Amino acid sequence: NPTLPALLDVLFRDAVNSTLGTHIANLAPANIPRQDLVAAFLTGFPGVNQLKTVTASEMSRLNTGIPAKPASQQSAFGVAGNDLAGFPNGRRPGDDVVDLALRVVMGRLCHPIPVNGTPTDLGLCKPADAPVGTAPFTDGAPLSAADFDSRFPYLKTPNPGATN
């Protein structure tokens, strides 16, 4: 059972229930074992970034058969944001992997995700397993492809610092 969802539950359950006017007993997903996490972080997704010989391991997988998207069409949320060319199918500078990982560990993949514009149930778990799986969890530091240059080293010139 992953620790992060349990910690987020302890830290934010009261605030979530108060804000939403709900009585969710546990924010953490209840699907154990977490096949959604295994697919997202260890094996990849069939047809997207899963290799022919599946070896559960933490590595970057890239399906070069999926064409890259121009920065203006990229979703910072990759595959979960209707962009098969994004994370976890490789890793682009504008992929907001922190927000995406937060959403995945809290059960986003238990709910249908848009694939080529069509809501798709991945069959990894059920929506009832993840009561806040569609919540837009964020670290508060938004990221997008527009934040980067289109050529290496991709980082834009820093903003001038404070005068003091």
Features from the language model and the residues they span:
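Surface-exposed extracytoplasmic segments
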Residues: 1-164
